[in-house]
Amino acid sequence: MFEQDYLMKLLLAFYQAMFKSLRRVTDEDEDPKEAADTLDEVVGNAVGMDGASLLSLTPESVVGVLQVSGTDPCVTEFIARSLLLSSEYLTQAKQGALASLRVEQARAIADAYGIDLPDDPANLSDLKEMAEQANA
């Protein structure tokens, strides 16, 4: 029960961070780089590592860290989708190389865990439902 509660809190934190970052970038003209940094921090927290350190790794190494740390498959989907959304923000912030790395990291995670990434990273409609299903 404790593990399920922890997982639900983690998934809801991801959903909230993604939704808030999207809303702030869209509605409040927040710096897209700051939004990307926020998502990267949430990813690091989910794995128990500094986000900047984790995401400085190659895509294959990020997958290795997730596998070694035993990260829950539901969480890995949120991580991959957060990285994909982060790449959109980094593109807006004219950080092309870093945006490409985030896309590669997201795809590597998706490939390793059998995740279908959305065409539109900003479409969060199914994430809340997914988080609620994890709690069921």
Question: PLM features: residue spans?
Answer:
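N-terminal alpha-helical interaction modules that lie
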Residues: 1-76, 130-136
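Structural register within alpha-helical repeat arrays
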Residues: 13-14, 20-21, 79, 86-89, ...
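The tetratricopeptide repeat
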Residues: 16, 75-78, 82, 119-127
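TPR/TPR-like (Sel1-like) alpha-helical repeat modules
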Residues: 32, 36-47, 97-115
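Boundary/linker segments of alpha-helical solenoid repeat arrays
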Residues: 47-52, 112-124
